């Protein structure tokens, strides 16, 4: 669906889609195909599909980016991905939008320590967990 949307809007030269997971480290993860859908998180499984994992530094390097906008909706991986990424790498993003699931305080502190001005929404109860949004921009 995402690829079709990119084609319909003539964005092929702007947006690239990698079928992968985001993590604090690069590697591979086997995902159980039966545990998918809205709100599914990436946890390692014995059976399923092996997918590559990329960290934020790898994503910037592989796409030859010195600056980027980051939008994360990764069902819980935002904590390791953001909190364990070096501040120098985080500063390469001009804008960061994050859907959070288990609280925002640590994420906000990390982003502010990287020089971002941060706004957040109050958590909303959705299905069986709370979610909210963080909007971080450079001054």
What residue ranges belong to the model's regions?
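Phosphate/nucleotide-binding beta-alpha loop and adjacent structural elements of enzyme active sites
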Residues: 1-139
């Amino acid at each position: 669906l995402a690829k079709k949307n990119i084609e319909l809007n003539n964005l092929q030269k702007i947006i690239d889609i990698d079928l992968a997971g985001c993590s604090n480290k690069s590697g591979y993860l086997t995902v159980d195909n039966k545990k998918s859908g809205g709100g599914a998180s990436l946890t390692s499984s014995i059976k399923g599909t092996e997918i590559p994992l990329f960290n934020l530094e790898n994503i910037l390097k592989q796409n030859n980016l010195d600056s980027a906008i980051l939008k994360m909706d990764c069902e819980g991986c935002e904590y390791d991905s953001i909190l364990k990424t070096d501040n120098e790498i985080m500063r390469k993003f001009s804008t960061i939008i994050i859907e959070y699931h288990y609280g925002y305080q640590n994420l906000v502190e990390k982003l502010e320590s990287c020089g971002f001005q941060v706004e957040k929404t109050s958590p909303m109860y959705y299905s069986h967990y709370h979610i909210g949004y963080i909007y971080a921009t450079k001054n």
